[in-house]
Amino acid sequence: MGQNGRVPCGLGLGWGDVDVFLVEATGVASVICYAAAICGCVYALAAGLLARGFVRSELAPAKDFPSVTILKPLHGAEPGLLTNLAGFCVQDYPGPVQIVFGVEDHADPAIDVVSRLIAEFPDCDIELVVNSYSHGTNRKVSNLINLAAEARHDVLVLSDSDIIVDPDYLKNIVGPLDAPGVGLVTCLYRSAAAPGLWPRLAAAAIDHHFLPSVLFGLKLGLAKPCFGSTIALRKTTLAMIGGFHSVVDQLADDYALGEMVRRAGLNVAIPSLIVEHACTHRTARDLFHHELRWARTIRFVNALGFIGSGVTHAFPLALLGTVLGGITPASIIVIAALACRFCLQMQLDRALGLRSNPFWLGPLRDLLSCAVFFASFFGRAVEWRGRRYAVLADNTLAYTGEVSRNANSVPSGALV
């Protein structure tokens, strides 16, 4: 170091200059965080109103009742599987309904669950397909291809194994297919949490983060989703877009199906029907890796929209602004962010008929969601059903051969 505390090499900067620069930089970063948090507060208030309006909108149940085949790919006997599947066997639907379940392995414990289902509902048209043939790297889609070969009816309904439905589900999901120009129907989902902290945190992510963000994006025309919770389409539409083979290597297979239908000139309908998604995460690791896969999936298919969603993390951003800039009058934004988040939570719970979580769970959920958001930018690997995949530039999957410690503990469906 030269005289007067100057850094040599002709940089002309002393340590005092560096200190000033760092103070100014953290001050600017603090202002940016506060500004983003204010945007997040506005979003929370608007999203709550949109959610109430969506839930109150009327459904258009089917007037005609075409024959339907429900395709259910399974893997493992996850908690509550029998109850989840039984809901599809008690549908109040006048038309013929075929249910095709499928697994890849003869030793899969889901086989016993389906056997019990067949015994409990002998009048239901239920088939079980056990087929280990792999058509590509996405094992769920590979399973669907094997199931679709057994489908006898024109309308296909796909639904993940962790989805819970009411008896009028088929009526309400098949009805919109009759509308002119509609090629596919999908629907939103809310949580059905098992007891425990991790399932409740997972449920809060769905009810208080996922749902309002999708509704907000739909209202502004920024979101074009398609969810594995439900996909209904006709065989002719599926054939027109290349069948399930066209997405057998895709990470976001459900999103890809919706995009292909739109590119074919047809619409994707999203009625106000909301099904339930079972949250049964057993450990913090299960929860984090499930949500990391979800976040990375969204980032890969809609990078700009995902980056923009960062402002929805109002409380963590306001907190970071205070950490960077110190406690100032602007720190009141932290309290405002908490108040707006609590307001959004109450409106959603009331609209969806949910039991409200303790207040402390909301800030904890917000901090976890923000951590997952930033973690999703580091790496292109995802875990699904005990296998690890690298996501390539075209959003296809490459199996890396690594197996996680809890092969059967993560819920089944891809959350997109």
Where on the chain are the PLM-derived regions?
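Acidic donor-binding/catalytic loop of UDP-sugar-dependent glycosyltransferases
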Residues: 109, 159-176
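Short beta-strand-to-loop acidic/aromatic patch adjacent to the donor-nucleotide binding site
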Residues: 144, 153-164
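Cell-envelope/extracellular polymer assembly enzymes that use nucleotide-activated donors
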Residues: 66-69, 98, 256
